[in-house]
A protein has these predicted regions:
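Polar-ligand-bearing catalytic/cofactor-coordination segments
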Residues: 1-56, 75-172
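Hydrophobic alpha-helical transmembrane segments
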Residues: 54-68
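Hydrophobic alpha-helical transmembrane segments of polytopic membrane proteins
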Residues: 66-78
């Protein structure tokens, strides 16, 4: 990776710190886990007496628990991934605004995609179910729009220029 590519990737990661994405993700996923345990408790409570299940600790309750966990996962995992993709898009805009180096961003995305054997454009269903990051093609197109001045990074740059505690743009 070139120095410019490293700078863009580092700026992207810095955005996660600036916006508190790790803490937000931890809180969100903790809430999902707590909600999952609560739902599991209800499922096990409802399963007692059915199918010969004597109490929540009965091994016969395990299939009911697994079905409940699967149902929770069908909602919780895509929700967590959607939040993560939003954080990634925002971090991309931050990196582009901070560095102003769209070509290095595009180059870094292409190299990372090749290194990780990422699919350029997964189906919407696959993305919704399994991807915590936006598709590479979408990220590259957003960077190219940003470079043409049609991207959505300007408001972010203005907000950071007014914030005394933020990182300033390169070259200022």
């Amino acid at each position: 990776y070139s120095d410019d590519e490293i700078e863009v990737v580092l700026a992207h990661e810095l955005a996660h710190h600036v916006y508190g994405d790790i803490w937000k993700g931890l809180l969100f996923e903790t809430g999902l886990i707590a909600g999952g345990f609560l739902l599991a408790s209800f499922v096990l409570g409802a399963a007692v007496g059915l199918f010969g299940i004597r109490d929540a600790g009965d091994i016969a309750a395990l299939p009911a628990l697994l079905l409940g966990a699967g149902a929770v996962s069908l909602v919780a995992v895509p929700a967590a991934h959607a939040m993560s993709r939003a954080h990634e898009r925002r971090a991309d805009r931050f990196a582009l605004t901070l560095t102003g180096n769209g070509p290095a961003f595009v180059s870094a995305m292409r190299r990372l995609a090749a290194q990780n054997m990422a699919e350029d454009e997964p189906s919407p269903l696959v993305q919704w179910l399994f991807h915590s990051h936006p598709p590479i093609r979408e990220r590259i197109e957003a960077a190219q729009e940003f470079q043409r001045g049609t991207g959505s990074g300007t408001a972010m740059a203005d907000r950071h220029d007014r914030d005394d505690t933020s990182v300033t743009k390169k070259g200022r």
